[in-house]
Amino acid sequence: MTSSPVPPTNSSDSSDSKVWSQRFESALNPVIAAFNASIHFDIALIEYDLTGSQAHVQMLAHSGIISQAEADAIDQGLEAIRQEYRQGQFQPGIEAEDIHFAVENRLIELIGDTGKKLHTGRSRNDQVGTDLRLYLHDQILQVQTLIRNWQQALVILASDHVQTLIPGYTHLQRAQPISLAHHLLAYFEMAERDWQRLREIDRRVNVSPLGLGALAGTPFPIDRQYTADKLGFADLYRNSLDGVSDRDFAIEFLCAASLIMVHLSRFSEEVILWASEEFGFIKLKDSCATGSSIMPQKKNPDVPELVRGKSGRVFGHLQSLLVVMKGLPLAYNKDLQEDKEAIFDGVTTIKACLEAMTILVAEGLEFQTPRLESAVGEDFSNATDVADYLSKQGVPFREAYNIVGAVVKTCLSQNKLLKDLTLEEWQQFHPQFADDIYSAISPRQVVAVRNSFGGTGFTQVQNALEQAKTLLSQSK
């Protein structure tokens, strides 16, 4: 079945015809009906709802609960609804209450009483849990792809800046010079943890609750493993009460999403700072910046500012779902309807932010190399290397540290940098200072000697780049 002469029902004039309405003596108040409905947002689950229902009816036939002919008719009817939805012809209103009733009602319109057998051996409680897990599994894979794209953009940019120096900061005070590529690859590592975290979470998402019923299982001889295999689930819930009420997987996803946004927001903050006149480390290219309505000279970093701001949305969704879950008795409660908008918007937000930040890194940032080079040579961020120099001459490090503190204090009082001191002045502080002190404290040498594993030394950074490229190539 690919089409039907039966027109889809899109009106909202049947609010008293709920599936459950025979239990009640009067119709639901229209305001309460609208308040109760979730169709306006859980329509996002329709493809997964249809897929889950198709697996369910084939299981019913496989288990001898309905005939194969009935299962095939239902399956074809569900596929017809899928095509109607994709063509914009199936647009249920609030009279449907939720996507599950909307699909079931439309199925009965299309194929008649056989459609009433769809829900045999199933509750909306295990049905929605199945839909949500199928949706989230799919979205996790998409987010992981976007993370890889973000990492790829970072690697490409870092490849151009292994030899570019930039001040490294602690407490937002200049600390030690580093390779710009090393700085960019720090975000690659954060993103890799994000990717791995999602993989771990997906193991717990990919567990089937289908067939658990409302809360206690079902008396029908169903085969839960059959539907799990059909839908690609790796495991089954072992307790019906837990399975229909569990939203740990959703909370875990929002935790992971929040960490993704933390990392994107941190990078955004740095881009905003670096693009300011006060730093002047980067210029934003026209394709990734906007202007002011009143100040014609402005070029605003809207992309990183929006990402920084949108992080709060995702954090809020995590908090809201934690609060929803904290007081719920077993098993299902209507409060759980509140999980979907948090998840849907969380997914939409992180996907949009990853896409935007990938474009920003790939084409929107122009590092001002001369400014960066001058920035690492106009301060005392090489002071640690003076202490290291003395330590290598046999001076205990703490003693060397105190000597260098006195050197810096003297330089500040005389408005000098370390490189401006004469050898005679150096030797007034300690006789071990020699001519090679000048090369030892040059910014490029300061970076080059930090060649321990994971350090900013140029050799280490190049090795890290190659490892990152290998990781990305292996994950394709």
Curated annotation (Swiss-Prot):
Molecular function GO labels: argininosuccinate lyase activity
Coiled-coil ranges from the UniProt annotation: none
Homology family: Belongs to the lyase 1 family. Argininosuccinate lyase subfamily.
GO terms classed as biological process: arginine biosynthetic process via ornithine; L-arginine biosynthetic process
EC number: 4.3.2.1
InterPro entries listed in its UniProt record: Arg_succ_lyase_C, Argininosuccinate_lyase, Fumarase/histidase_N, Fumarate_lyase_CS, Fumarate_lyase_fam, Fumarate_lyase_N, L-Aspartase-like
Protein name per the record: Argininosuccinate lyase
Keywords annotated in UniProt: Amino-acid biosynthesis, Arginine biosynthesis, Cytoplasm, Lyase
Keyword Oxidoreductase on entry: no
Gene transcribed to yield this protein: argH
Pfam (any one): Lyase_1
Organism: Acaryochloris marina (strain MBIC 11017)
UniProt-annotated location(s): Cytoplasm
